[in-house]
UniProtKB/Swiss-Prot annotation:
A motif (Bipartite nuclear localization signal) lies at residues 185-195, 213-217. Residues 58-68 have a biased composition (Acidic residues). The lineage of its organism: Eukaryota, Viridiplantae, Streptophyta, Embryophyta, Tracheophyta. InterPro entries: Gln-Leu-Gln_QLQ, GRF, WRC_dom. This is Growth-regulating factor 11. Its main location: nucleus.
Length: 269
């Protein structure tokens, strides 16, 4: 384009018909125009090549972004609904898991090589169930649920035979929210944090020390001897005699008062 502008300026400064010098100027103009067009063509070719390379690079970068997850930015991940659990049951299961971890950690190295962590957990759970059964206390449901799930999940027959825990009434399960945490222990408390550490009597709630509380103590009856002594036998007779003498004295004194009062009344009349 710059070459065309220069050619136009030269043509304007040297109008046609200027003689031989004018003819020489036309040849120079034609050569300059050819050179300018060639330069412009080379520049366009170079620019087109550079633009093509840039386009290729942009396409490659776009492909890389797509492969790295650029498309995932437009997607919305929808998570499955989490079932809501009972907070008390979740806390009980969490406490049980912590106890299992502490039990596994307390086992010396090499001592529990015959049992795996899951087997130790199952043994501990069964021992706790046995404690409730030995104390004749209803077994909490959070201790029975894992066993029930393992039985029903092992085969289809178990699921058909025990579809729910409601049919297992003979196990005396505790469906309440406050199960007994330590079966077999005395339940005497001060209403706050303290609790008696002694073991309860069989089929009872309290230990020997706290069994008398809350019950009426029997009244002790005084039993007299059946064989009266000689001295004791004479005393009642003397007492009766004195009582009879007192009664006769009272009668005599009352009669005297009446006798004295009667003549006084006659004299006054």
């Amino acid at each position: 384009m710059a070459a065309e502008g220069e050619a136009k300026k030269d043509s304007a400064s040297n109008p046609p018909g200027g003689g031989g010098g004018g003819g020489g100027g036309e040849e120079e103009e034609d050569s300059s125009l050819a050179v300018g067009e060639a330069a412009v063509g080379v520049g366009e070719a170079g620019g087109g090549g550079g633009g093509g390379e840039k386009a290729d690079r942009e396409e490659e970068e776009g492909k890389e972004d797509v492969e790295e997850g650029g498309v995932c930015k437009d997607l919305v991940l929808v998570e499955d609904a989490v079932p809501v659990e009972d907070p008390e049951e979740a806390a009980a299961t969490a406490a049980l898991q912590e106890e299992m971890k502490a039990l596994v950690e307390s086992v010396p190295v090499g001592a529990g090589a015959a049992f795996t962590a899951m087997q130790l957990q199952e043994l501990e759970q069964q021992s706790r169930v046995y404690q409730y059964m030995a104390a004749r206390v209803p077994v909490p449901t959070h201790l029975v649920f894992p066993i029930w799930k393992s039985v029903t999940g092992a085969s289809s027959e178990g699921a058909q035979k025990y579809p729910t825990l409601m049919g297992l009434a003979t196990l005396c399960l505790d469906f309440g929210k406050n199960p007994e945490p330590e079966p077999g222990r005395c339940r005497r408390t001060d209403g706050k944090k303290w609790r008696c550490w002694r073991n309860a009597i069989a089929n009872e709630k309290y230990c020997e020390r706290h069994m008398h509380r809350g019950r009426k103590r029997p009244v002790q009856l005084v039993v007299e001897d059946d064989e009266p002594d000689s001295t004791s036998g004479s005393k009642p007779a003397s007492g009766k005699a004195t009582e009879g003498g007192k009664k006769t004295d009272d009668k005599s004194s009352s009669s005297k008062k009446l006798a004295v009062a009667a003549p006084a009344a006659v004299e006054s009349t």
